[in-house]
Amino acid sequence: GMSFKHSATPDGVIFREVLDSDRVRYSWSAADVPQLPSEPGRPPLWMFAPTVVVSSGDYAAFGRKLSAALTEKTRNAPKAAELARKLAPETMRIDERINAIRTWVARHIRPAGPALNELPWSAFTPADVTLQSGYGDSADRAILLGAMLKAAGVDYRFVAATELGYAAAATRPLMRAPQNIFTKVLVYLPGFDSHLNDTGEYASLGSTASEEAIGLSLDTGRLMTIRPRRKGESATSCAYRIRLRADGSAQIEASCSYFGLPYQSMHRKFKEMTPAESDQFFESLAAGISQEAQYKGKPVAAFDGYPGKLYFTLEVPHFAMVSGDYLQFSLPGFSALSNMVKTASSTRRTPLWRNGPAKTVLEYRIEMPGNFVPVGLGPERFELGRPGTAAFYRHVEEAS
């Protein structure tokens, strides 16, 4: 008979199984369920509220059938194969071949169409048709990538991806009762531990917009965490050196590095900005620290390599407010980190859900003027609880 799987969010749901002649009756009930407010950042109700999920699906069978349907459309693609050999000849290193094909598809094949779980697999488009039309949905673009990579001698696998971050609250009910929640197709390269098909032409090989999301390995039929290649994780790291003077003025040296999706965003920005727009960008950057800030020398943006780098030095006349024997100032760049952990209110009735990673590293080296000592540095240690992980530490080192 048909395999029947079910799962219920444990808190507040009562499950009963009754044998009735030649049938089995299942029932679920929940009582006194409170009305929940619609708060910013609230996770889907099925993650924490009384919910029943029923399925007759099987991920292994789903994966085999989806892989076969996608692979079938990669065959008989002479135009895609010809283009791949032209873009990525055997004289190129294999990573250069991959980058040439990935960049071409990202630049010339416009994303358009429904999500993977919104269309029948019979609607998948052959690789050469997508190549000619210049657009395609996630599955169509994955098929074209697969056909071109195969022609270039690159091993690949198809992976189905969701929009959900991989967390116990999300994966537990999905493992117990399989659901078709897969919205896009990625192309995985085993030899490079990299995923393709969800980033643009300005991304680095190894980064993915599906970072830490729930995926399905079509080969094994198992749920997995989609991870970027080492050093492909999305992150921003900024180091500030602040030379503070007794009159409140300061010189600020900043060095920022961009990885993964932030690299893609900044790389695209600096490639597509006009000189006037670039000037406006740096004016806005300085004004974010102080309206009186002036650049000392020319700021440097280096995004042709990886990671992307941004360097600048500012002279700020009134960086710190002089109040008696005290100098008071705010740390530049800290608002980006504080915005990540704010919950929009002081109290909540529902969990706060962050559906993806966000990594920001800030380092401050502050040179104090003579006879000044740091005070009011905030808590010794602060940490957010489950399911997220975020911590703040302080370390004060006196100059010798």
Per-segment meaning from a language model:
Residues 1-400:
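A sensor for short, sequence-defined functional sites
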